[in-house]
Amino acid sequence: MSHAVANKTETEAAPNSSLKQSAAPQPANSHDAKLLNGTLARTNGLTHAASVATSSSGSYGSSSAAGSNAGSGGPTSSASLSIAAGVASSTALPLPPSSNGLQMPYERFRADDTSYVPIAQFYAGRSVFITGGTGFMGKVLVEKLLRSCPEIRNIYLLIRPKRGQEVSARLTELLNAPLFESLRQEKPKELSKVIPISGDITSEELGISEKDQNLLCRNVSVVFHSAATVKFDEKLKLSVTINMLGTKRLVELCHRMLSLDALIHVSTAYCNCDRTDVSEVIYAPPYNPDDIISLINWLPEDILDQLTPRLIGKRPNTYTFTKALAEHMLLKEAGNLPVAIVRPSIVTASLNEPFAGWVDNFNGPTGLVSALAKGMFRTMMCEKNYVADMVPVDIVINLMIAAAWRTATRKSNNLLIYNCCTGQRNPIIWSEFVKHAMTSVRKHPLEGCLWYPTGDLRMNRPMNTLNCIAKHFLPAYILDGVARIMGKKPFVVNVQNKIAKAVECLEYFATRQWRFKDDNVHALLHTLSPKDREIFVFDVRHINWDKYVERYVLGFREFLFKQRPESLPASRKRMLRLYYLHQLTKLVAVLLTWRFLMSRSKRLNDLWSSFLENALRMARLIPFL
């Protein structure tokens, strides 16, 4: 099968060719020169950086300049200097001679196929290792495996000790969450299959003890890597450490596993957000991942923070930047491991499993819809006719489980990528999503709403800024002022600042549109038996967005705000009062504006008097008046 490598003009260099760089790169401008000179003067560990960069000479994406620098005894590699100075070559790094960008064969399930192994049967007797198991997606993955693959042997969770809490206590807290309620009642013994592994994704060897490493290497045959920092404004150093180095360290562990059948890496559809059309391929990286890792090891963090905007280029944040490089790290380091990458778009509340509307965080649209429900969010920069590519978390998890099954059973080292998105097969635009959300938060209001939920999407920045001041911050300062007078603690301004920060992170994705191709997802769907399609649902064409958004609102009402359905009647009465107050406020605002204009313009006053006089005359012509 031929390699469907995207952007041929960027990647048609021979696989073993090197990135072209100037022998003596110069800073792009005087400001960068000062930063770089200051760095070289203040940093003592540059010799180590040179050895790291030089050791990669001749490997995938390595720099010929780095190799020549080794003999000169220079303090750092030419590649690292180029990156720091912001003058790295525009020539894209070649992709390694791997099966990047393959399209999955389109094979339909046949009822007479005796070789077909059901997904649950595939997981029977197997042990699974999960990173990020205490996160939003990880929790749903653990619950789904326990519920739908009852003969699974063990699930090992990488858990970090946190705030003095041991991993066993954190696991107990996890399994006592509402998400596992049905399992606790119906299959309590299944929970004993979950085994904590103490570790830290930011540490060498993942912070796992030698004993636990040996345990994993002997027993694990499927690995799900979902650990990541999803903070869009994360520092580059920490983002690289978690998203890139964490991936590299996990792959090193996987190479030691005696019976590994599948490694599923969770990326993001937006790792290639610098292009409009995104296929199920790995695109040429902006930099050699090893150079970026070398850079964070020797560059002072304050200088690194200043250079971050130049490094990430057209990408909006460190999250998408490091996720893109992590895919290349995986492609380079995996070798002959059976690997697949799942790229979800914006992950939101569950569609059906384990119950509709489950969500445990305020990230992304959840936080904004929650603020809308509270009456604290009324305007946003957004292209209302663009696709809001959101995907329910259980859809992503079912795809991950099926992708691991397919990776293991097809017995091929070719890396496949699955874009898990809704925009191509069942799109919803932002205006429709907001309309459904507005209807739902009014129908199922939160307790303690501050105002009647309403708002608009805009693409006029000055108008949006004026509305933010008038509708967000001005009322917030007034309410906090009243709170201080009454001797209460002010909080509204602080909440509005958090909302503004969340909006700023989401704005990039709400004002742009992408076309994510999902042919591999569609092909995988058709290889499943009808029964497996019912158990592991990831066909996004069946999502009813109106019903989904309503369940979404009911879900965060119950699971985030801890408000029971019994409180809805009282909340609806309060919502009705807020509606009348909202209408009265608008009427008063119109009258005050009109009164102000009348007092400032004699001509307008005369026109108004003339209008009233003519209206009165016409009224007298009506017989019954």
Swiss-Prot record:
| Gene Ontology terms for molecular function | alcohol-forming long-chain fatty acyl-CoA reductase activity; alcohol-forming very long-chain fatty acyl-CoA reductase activity
Q: Which InterPro entries match?
A: FAR (IPR026055), FAR_C (IPR033640), Far_NAD-bd (IPR013120), NAD(P)-bd_dom_sf (IPR036291)
Query: Keyword Lipid biosynthesis: yes or no?
Result: yes
Q: Where is this region: Disordered?
A: 1-39, 56-75
User: What is one term from the GO cellular component aspect held by the record?
Assistant: peroxisomal membrane
One annotated GO biological process: long-chain fatty-acyl-CoA metabolic process
- Catalytic EC class: oxidoreductase
EC number annotated for this UniProt entry: 1.2.1.84
- Quote the subcellular location field of this record: Peroxisome membrane
The reactions it catalyses are: a long-chain fatty acyl-CoA + 2 NADPH + 2 H(+) = a long-chain primary fatty alcohol + 2 NADP(+) + CoA
Q: Which residues form a coiled coil?
A: none
Q: Where are the transmembrane segments?
A: 578-597
User: Which portions of the chain have biased composition (kind: Polar residues)?
Assistant: 14-29
Q: How does it sit in the membrane?
A: Single-pass membrane protein
Q: Name one Pfam family in it.
A: NAD_binding_4
Q: What does this protein do?
A: Catalyzes the reduction of C16 or C18 fatty acyl-CoA to fatty alcohols.
Similarity section: Belongs to the fatty acyl-CoA reductase family.
What is this protein's record name? Putative fatty acyl-CoA reductase CG5065
Q: Which organism is it from?
A: Drosophila melanogaster (Fruit fly)
**Lineage of the source organism?**
Eukaryota, Metazoa, Ecdysozoa, Arthropoda, Hexapoda
